[in-house]
């Protein structure tokens, strides 16, 4: 039904909608009507002479007509635009103070629910009627749920608002948030309604609310976990173009713990991703969202979330037809915390955010008062710190934060230390009503302020490191303070322009080791020459001449991309015998070979999970993150070596793993067992793990067990494996594939986490970089052959170690596909400075692999 204003605007003599009026009466001029009369001319010649004046009149009339037409068009557009209506939906909740919560309120089909919902809707209608930009345009309100406190009503209200009033309406609704309803409004109902909260909502969130086919209500029973999942999980995909929701409840004075055990929905992209949102309320209001999820997560990813009260709402809004199984989750209730924080009196100790490493609950405040002995000072070291929120600028700690000594800390931070000037310190933790993270893990220590780091160097962050690490060219302090104000030793160090010291042999090695790049300045070759990747200078005529004049192949890389050329050792040979001179054309998404063979057999190197965990104080990998990684167990010895899966029946490993030693026949295939899809060595019987024996071991015939040259072996499984989310092959690089200096590559394995340490239970990962071959030969003289590649950090810290042998070097390419760059072979110690790891260079053996097994 049209409003009074709209009806008036429809009349011929009423309001036109903006205060303009029209009348058909002629205007009076001294009591006479104004008119225009045209008289015939008596003299045609006079008429001809008057022609120009006539044209002026005609042009004036035409101009006036055009102006009036334009004005009329503008007015029509203006009034039409003002009459355009926009659907606006506000979602929120309110408190009903003089009602007690009844169990029947959990059932939206109960009479009690309907009666109370009717009262709430009447009260909302009366509230809106007092707001001029809302009342006339209110269409309907719907109550979706009730919960304790005394009674909290969750609702959404729909409005049909003129386009030009939308901003004003949103502002009016914003001003009504968290308000107490006036007494007159309360008197219109039989209950007291307070604290009305409402926010604009995405209409997709409200769609199909009357359709309960994908709406579920669950109530926790005791402390027993309750399982639920998307419809059809895991055998069929969840519905497309739908809205599903799960209402989770617990008993009064409890909170809920929610964990997604399996999560696989459409990949996050800009096409309107399928989205799972968890709310710390029963109304889908964005400011109360705890987390939003899309994509796929490995089972080991931390997806545990806590509520601040006894309810949670989960929504799944789908807009695609991509086939994904959805999620499986469990929840249970636990007692609400009576307090958070407390007094810690000791010389040292630990504390953490609530429910760490799970996500801390929203809307919480914790304060720890720490006190150490009187004659000491206290420092707090944060070993893990994750307090991130979406769309919050870095350094802007306005939402979740930790406050110490008046300074706030937030976001994701490396290990850092905060200290006091006496024996007491106070740590305050705050989370707001939305978006939580995993929080922090911290320890406090007492120290003597006169000597805070006995026998060590103290970083500006308060961390203590060994004195010999000062001014050694590597930043051991996270704030680089150990490398500030240094005087470099010119005998073996280079002084960067920013005054940092670097090893002299790093100069002109094609890798920028100084932050300002000064170690690579002045290294250019003379005019008309080509600079190789290893720093060597060649005449330009030797570039792209089909010969490896540099020694590292860089002079033959990226030559005549994609064009057929004569075949050499540095070109890519297609199956039809033709060659293309393009760097790494294999499986790059572009057909460079005329027969398309460079894009065949590319079902490899892909991971099923799109999300990986953040590393906290270690290098634990996620389940399924490296699906080609294999654990090799020798009879009676447990895990000894790694391997990589390259086909359903074949693996690659290191030849030195199969050399007989101390009376044990490691060369016998029958003593070995391969575990594929394994993540945790203590869970070899876990679902998804496949166990196989070996049928054959093929060591390279030129393998030298003294120099470790040709350190590669092929292993045939006794029966093929079945590919799954956690078992996939890695891509093998062609013989011409190059891995340039400085490229980031990943090493994985269950080897020792430190030299002389113990093997890891969880699969470890470490990012390392390809090291210049000339530099490597300088560091390990007379030990490096063309079949070897040096990878690591000359600063040490990350490397393969005992037990990692035979495992893969996984090199990520631009499209996310992984190629195996090498095989873990040998090294001097583990992760030592200036002692990079040495790996078997895999492209060198590509033809041998194909000749042996046809892969």
Curated annotation (Swiss-Prot):
The modification Phosphoserine is found at residue 13. The chain crosses the membrane at residues 56-76. The gene is ST14. GO terms for molecular function: serine-type endopeptidase activity. It is an enzyme of class 3 (hydrolase). This is Suppressor of tumorigenicity 14 protein homolog. Residues 86-203 form the SEA domain. Residues 77-855 are extracellular. Its EC number is 3.4.21.109.
